[in-house]
Amino acid sequence: MKKIYFTFLVPIFLYSQNLEELVNLTIENRLVESSKQNLDALKDEYKSVQRGYLPKLDAGASYSINEHEYPSTPKKRANAYGSVNYMLYDGGKKYDIYDGYETNIKSGEKSLDALKNNLSLTVIQYYFDYLSLEAKKDAKQKEIEQLTAQEDRIGRFYNAGTTTEDELQKIVSRLQNAIVELQEIELNIITITHNLEYITGTQVSITDGSKLEDINNLIQKNPRFDIQALDFVTQSKQSVAQAQKSGYYPTVTLDNTFNYYDNNYDKFIDTDSNNHQNVASANMKWNLFSFGQTKYQYESKQKEYLASRSNFEYEKNKADVDLQLALKSYNIAKAKIKSTEATLKAAQSAYEIIKSKFENGLIDNVAFLQSLTEKYDAISQHKKAINDLEVKKATIIYHSGEKLQEYIR
């Protein structure tokens, strides 16, 4: 019997997770992994661009056979060459491109943090909603137990002819409604569980006991992660706009090419004793007039930058308002806990009195049923208020630009 008991416990133990474990699973899911790969791809692209500005070494060879031979055109010719090319100056575009990539990478990193925080907040909401539903389920089950007991009690009185059928049917009706409500609660619990399994990518079984750290001393040091990402995107667009100005300046390249060739004549004598040639050159190119092409390219990118800056300022102000609303919501949630606690005490006290009067035949079952419902509703509402406070704390941490997983205990 002990072996069977242990066998049933093992799966529960293996798949049971608290809030910290659920969040850790979530921030390593496939969506996050996809974002990481995109960020790595951007970093590799930046490395490629950097390498593109280093000297380039090329080599090549050719072999040709001509139909007609002339003194300057051998019958057969072999050629091999090697060349080195270096962009000495590109009008300053290189450094603006570098700045653009670096800020884009920083934006990608902050976007990744924002994604993790968004997912973490979603999991936290699911977790505490799950606990609230479990508390509501427990209260509803106890209400059903009370209603079932009263159904048996009133049923005996009805069979004895000491009470009317409508008194019994009121209890039966309330019991059936409570059973349906319990089924709806269980469906909501299953829905949350499935949503968590979808986000985490694994089977979950939730354990309670997790909370978030106190936030009374929390100071906002940085904007929200997505706002930081927008800021870096804006900086990147500014760098791209500045890069367009390079069209006003010259480009300078350095080249060195070494050629080796072997000429084979059938009819003529090769009079050229040299079989190699080395050419070193410095080249400058300066576009003096292009009908305003560079001007309009710059203005186009500058307008994109200004649009991005306006969007950033708008979202930043909106995020500041969201934080202030979250703080007010948190204070209301704390007050709600005190309110529901007082309501619970009053409901429990009233229920005990009304139950005693009902069982002694001093009042009808309408008042009793109302009192019973109010008691268990008060229990579930109080526990929900406690759980909602944790969600409010998480929302403040989220809007304060902090990583949620660091505040779970």
Predicted feature residues:
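Sec-dependent N-terminal signal peptides
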Residues: 4-13
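Bacterial Sec-pathway N-terminal export signals of envelope proteins
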Residues: 16-58, 162-166, 197-242, 249, ...
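Periplasmic alpha-helical coiled-coil/stalk elements that build and connect Gram-negative outer-membrane
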Residues: 21, 116-228, 233-235, 241, ...
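A glycine-/polar-enriched beta->alpha junction
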Residues: 27-31, 43-55, 82-100, 110-117, ...
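Membrane-embedded beta-strand positions of outer-membrane beta-barrel proteins
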Residues: 35, 57-61, 230, 252-256, ...
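Small/polar, glycine/serine/threonine/aspartate-rich low-complexity segments that form flexible
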Residues: 60-93, 97-99, 256-293, 297, ...
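Short, charged, amphipathic alpha-helical segments
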Residues: 99-102, 165-176, 299, 365-376
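Acidic, low-complexity, intrinsically disordered peripheral segments
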Residues: 381-409
